[in-house]
Amino acid sequence: MPTKAELEATITELEHKIRRLDRSLNQTRIDLAELPTAAYNRFETPHLNDNVREALTRASAEWEADVKDPSERINLYIKSCHGIGWSWEADYVKNGQIAWCGAFAAWCHTRVKFDIRKKIFPSCYRMYQAWGQTSRKIDPMKVQPGDIVVVYAAKRSIQGDHITVCVDNSDFGSDGFITTIEGNAHGTFPDGSYGEGVIKRERKLTEFAHVYRLVADDFDEQ
């Protein structure tokens, strides 16, 4: 058992360490205050261009429309020229009849050239083949609203398993999440209930397979 003198010496040493830590903490606070905001707030919401704003507006409108699977409205994503334009498909009347997550993303990004929406948006595989080796594939840590985020499901396919649209990255970080609006998925409806259709949910970085950001040449001229 330590003596009284030894304990007093330990207390004195700890008090010195606390004072040194206080000085270091105060200096760090001063240094932080002098930095521009952008130097440490790396997840600040960026300026959104018109194409991205339009996609986010359309995504939110579909979510607020409370589209539950199956729904006649899903035919618009699949068959109309504002979605993927697969007009030859049979009417969607049964849950699981076709995987339509990419068709929903195409509906949101309707300003993208029709040929791209028709040929690339319909599946994770098509996106990976067309964009996986291009500048559209970005660092997942740089995800922004409007980006197409392909996530893993149980299969964890190399191309990813499900297509989503990022609508908010304000809570993102290595331990945080983004908010997505998705079609053909389970999540939250506008009234807070849980179900399948056009839903909103949170996705963590560990779920990301690939993040794609469309480039200017992908859009129709306005």
Segments from the language model and where they lie:
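N-terminal capping segments
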Residues: I30-V112
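Short, highly selective alpha-helical patches that border small-molecule cofactor pockets
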Residues: L7, G102-A105, T164
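N-terminal amphipathic/basic helix or basic patch
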Residues: E6-A9, E13-H16, D50, E54-T57
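...with weaker cross-activation on analogous glycine-rich loops/strands in unrelated enzymes
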Residues: D115-P190
